Amino acid sequence: MGFGSCSRHALFTPAAFSGSFTTMTTSCFKRVYTAQIHGGDALGKRLPSVSSFSGQLPRHGLHRQSLAFFSTSHRRQTSPPPSPRTTSQSPTVPSKASTTPPTSLNTSKPIATESQDKTDWSIIVKLAGNIWPKNNPNVKFRVIGALTLLVAGKVLNVQVPFFFKTIVDSLNVPITESTTVWVLAGASIAGYGAARILTTLFGELRNAVFASVAQNAIRKVARETFEHLLNMDMKFHLERQTGGLTRAIDRGTKGISFILSSIVFHVIPTALEISMVCGILSWKFGWDFAAVTAITMLLYTWFTIKTTAWRTTFRKQANAADNKGATVAVDSLINYEAVKSFNNEKYEVAQYDTTLKAYEKASVKIATSLAALNSGQNFIFSSALTMMMLLGAQGIVKGTMTVGDLVLVNQLVFQLSLPLNFLGTVYRELRQSLIDMDVMFNLQSLNSAIKDTPTAKPLHLKGGEIEFRNVAFAYHPERPIFRDLSFKIPAGQKVAIVGPSGCGKSTVFRLLFRFYDSNSGQILIDGQDIKTVTLDSLRRSIGVVPQDTPLFHADILHNIRYGNLEATDEQVYEAARKAHVEGTIQRLPEKYATKVGERGLMISGGEKQRLAVARVLLKDPPVLFFDEATSALDVYTETELMRNINSILTGQGKTSVFIAHRLRTISDADLIIVLQDGYVAEQGTHEQLLAMPGGVYHRLWQAQLTESTQPTDEEIERQREELEVVDEKKKQ
């Protein structure tokens, strides 16, 4: 689900409706099902929208158990059909650089516990701060206005049965030829109509007044959560599925909407109406009527809560199967090419169907248990109405009550049936919303392992000298990457870091950029420990072209401008020319307005890398880091691009670090650092390292030399001219 939909979640309020309804189809292949509303909880039933009711209701939020799937990189495990496969797991990071562990999402405990009640209360207190902000009188005014309209609407709603009673008593007289309706009951009929109209009007005004309060609270909490997630360290994001995080935010914000709407539009009005009805019955007809009403409400509430708690077990099973099905479907579709490459369509369908079967089984239990809930609720309420009718009939026989009084009692009690019908749904959804909000607020409470110290100061660059001093680091405690790494990158020079795969070349950048912190040792820039400077100033001073180029699902212009959001179009075009991607862009039908697709999958790997180079050139930081920045380019484009980058670096005196497997791209570096087994094995210029027979660099160079030979400038120019001639002939 798109994250932006959170703010459009509808508010709910009780309204009269009956008949069947069908749930809206939601994201991640949620099933469509139907249920009958008779007076109790319904499968997936929620209160209708305040603005309109079209017969379709959104599904409820999912239980805490269903959120557990996103706590780690998750893949389903079911009995596979003929083609078994292995699954990969996301790497974890050592405890030294760990993030505060997430709150447990275990759901084996009962729904309502003492600790959970305390948590629920703390959530409500947090939410109250968003709907009653200290420095926003406009929001407070709207809350007061909504509550005033609520009370006025309920008072008028209770008057409707009184007008009905008056009409009945007025017509319960001998009728003559001169008798007219307006003479007997005209005023009462007019009052009856006015009361009903004003009740509805006040209800709609209440919804309109309170809507901005609820949506403002949703927006504020969602923005704060999203901002907090962006400030978390890399370990946190590597350990969680992005889809799971967005679903947690979405459910949490929907939970805010439901809690606000249920409290303002259901809980408070129902409690107020029950109190008023009991008071009226006791005042006008005696304590026995009020006692029957109070006992009925208590028994009805107790039965509904107990039965709903029992049914929640089945709902948890359905939610778990639903989440698993969503994970299977999304995982399969994202890896569409792999599915097709290995002809595993039937396997994926079988995996998905297994979750559908589990969902079907749980849904049948939900539907059948609904009958018990509806039957019990109907029995309790019908018994109460029968007792009321008996007491009323006795009053009429004794002469203490009129027929209109009997109608009044019936109408007063019957008006309570509608909000009580939703009691099961409100209770279940209220508990679920609190759980969903707890998950979201727990995300806000997590602390990032990488953050500014209280005394952090902005980085003061003097030239861009970088020094690693006795650095030790490991992603996994049992597999250290660096043991005692020490080297120095001179300011304003081009330095290359090379070595065998897995020696930690890319880790150098991750530590320098503070995606992770070293376990021990120091990393210095111009003599300043990077742990003592602000993250913002540090990361603004470093530009990186990563090995796996991250692109947004937007146009090319935006993806380049992302390096400097304040850059003009002309500056973007100039950066594209420097990155040798301008010609490619101009050949596209929509040029700079061309969408690159999700993760840039609609363009080639080489084009993605050149866009990344253009982006970092537009950022223009004093320190540049190229992590296999040209690995997807052909030899000719790579050579020209590197020549252009070198000219830029030479003219501006920037410190640049190149990580490369193709050694010919960094043979002109001022310094080459060779890593192996967590140490600096060798360092020097290209010529110095080649003069060390048997050295690591010498062996790597010889191995690559047998595969290809670096072309000269004349060969590059000649072959490019030949390609241009071929292209011209094709155009003709």
Swiss-Prot record:
Keyword Mitochondrion tagged: yes
A molecular-function term among this protein's GO annotations: ABC-type transporter activity
Residue interval of the organelle targeting sequence: 1-55
Record topology, Mitochondrial intermembrane segments: 165-181, 284, 400-405
InterPro entries to which the protein is assigned, alphabetical: AAA+_ATPase (IPR003593), ABC1_TM_dom (IPR011527), ABC1_TM_sf (IPR036640), ABC_transporter-like_ATP-bd (IPR003439), ABC_transporter-like_CS (IPR017871), P-loop_NTPase (IPR027417), Type_1_exporter (IPR039421)
Result of knocking out the encoding gene: Increases susceptibility to copper toxicity and decreases fitness upon co-incubation with macrophage like cell lines. Increases RNA level of genes involved in iron uptake. Increases mitochondrial iron levels. Increases mitochondrial reactive oxygen species (ROS) levels. Increases mitochondrial complex I activity. Decreases cellular heme levels. Sensitive to hydrogen peroxide. Abolishes cell population growth on the non-fermentable carbon source ethanol and acetate. Decreases cell population growth rate; growth rate improves in a low oxygen environment.
Region of interest (Disordered), ranges: 71-114, 708-732
Binding residue positions for ATP: Y475, G499, P500, S501, G502, C503, G504, K505, S506
A Pfam family assignment: ABC_tran
Basic and acidic residues bias: start-end ranges: 717-732
Keyword field: ATP-binding, Membrane, Mitochondrion, Mitochondrion inner membrane, Nucleotide-binding, Transit peptide, Translocase, Transmembrane, Transmembrane helix, Transport
Membrane topology term: Multi-pass membrane protein
EC number in record: 7.-.-.-
Biased composition (Polar residues): 96-114
Stretches that traverse the bilayer: 144-164, 182-202, 263-283, 285-305, 379-399, 406-426
SMART domains: AAA
GO BP, sorted A to Z: intracellular iron ion homeostasis; iron-sulfur cluster assembly; iron-sulfur cluster export from the mitochondrion
Family: Belongs to the ABC transporter superfamily. ABCB family. Heavy Metal importer (TC 3.A.1.210) subfamily.
Subunit structure, interactors included: Homodimer.
PANTHER family listed in its UniProt record: ATP-BINDING CASSETTE SUB-FAMILY B, IRON-SULFUR CLUSTERS TRANSPORTER ABCB7, MITOCHONDRIAL
Name under which the protein is recorded: Iron-sulfur clusters transporter ATM1, mitochondrial
Species per Swiss-Prot/TrEMBL record: Cryptococcus neoformans var. grubii serotype A (strain H99 / ATCC 208821 / CBS 10515 / FGSC 9487)
Gene it is expressed from: ATM1
